[in-house]
């Protein structure tokens, strides 16, 4: 059994916990038992590809850790999962959830106070550490060495905040 398969199986046990923290209660749909879904037979999931190993596209299908979690939650609800890639800004702002575009968002989203004011989070299922990468032979050895330098980061992410 591969490590990815073992992790996926372990996450099946976490599906109810994940669901309790990330389902939008503002949707207009009904179905899935006591959970309101946009479409009664589908768990609509917003994500942002590419972000290996969490979510990325392969042969036109969104796959990865978050996709596996979405499938497990949908299976637990007795519905199918439909994953849609939207901009990370749409995830970060909560617009994907509040606009009725998705029931849940799964995209390796770091928990921040600003994000907690816009959406409910599940229990943390991945602890990330931020770092700035430089070439091995670089003279940069600390964040202070980057003062005034241009640093690349994805907009609206905790990585961007860290880089600032």
Report residues per predicted region:
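Bacterial N-terminal signal peptides that target proteins for export
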Residues: 1-12
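Residues that flank catalytic or metal-binding motifs in active/ligand-binding sites
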Residues: 13, 41, 128
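C-terminal motif of bacterial Sec signal peptides marking the signal peptidase cleavage site
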Residues: 18-21
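Bacterial signal peptide processing site
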Residues: 23-26
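Bilobed "Venus flytrap"/periplasmic-binding protein-like clamshell domains
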Residues: 52, 62-76, 109, 127-164
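Short glycine-/acidic-enriched loop or helix-start segments at secondary-structure transitions
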Residues: 55-57, 115-117, 162-163
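Acidic, polar ligand-binding/catalytic clefts
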Residues: 71, 80-145
């Amino acid at each position: 059994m591969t490590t990815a398969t073992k992790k996926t199986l372990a996450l099946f046990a976490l599906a109810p916990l994940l669901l309790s923290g990330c389902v939008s209660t503002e949707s207009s749909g009904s179905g899935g038992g006591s959970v309101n879904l946009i479409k009664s037979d589908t768990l609509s999931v917003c994500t942002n590809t590419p972000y290996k190993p969490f979510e990325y596209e392969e042969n036109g299908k969104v796959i990865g850790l978050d996709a596996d979690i979405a499938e497990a939650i949908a299976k637990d609800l007795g519905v199918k999962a439909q994953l849609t890639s939207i901009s990370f800004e749409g995830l970060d702002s909560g617009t994907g959830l509040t606009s009725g575009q998705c029931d849940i968002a799964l995209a390796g989203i770091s928990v921040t106070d600003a994000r907690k004011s816009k959406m409910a989070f599940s229990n943390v299922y991945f602890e990330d550490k931020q770092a700035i990468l430089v070439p091995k032979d670089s003279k940069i050895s600390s964040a202070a060495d980057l003062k005034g330098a241009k640093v690349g980061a994805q907009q609206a992410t905790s990585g961007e905040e860290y880089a600032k």
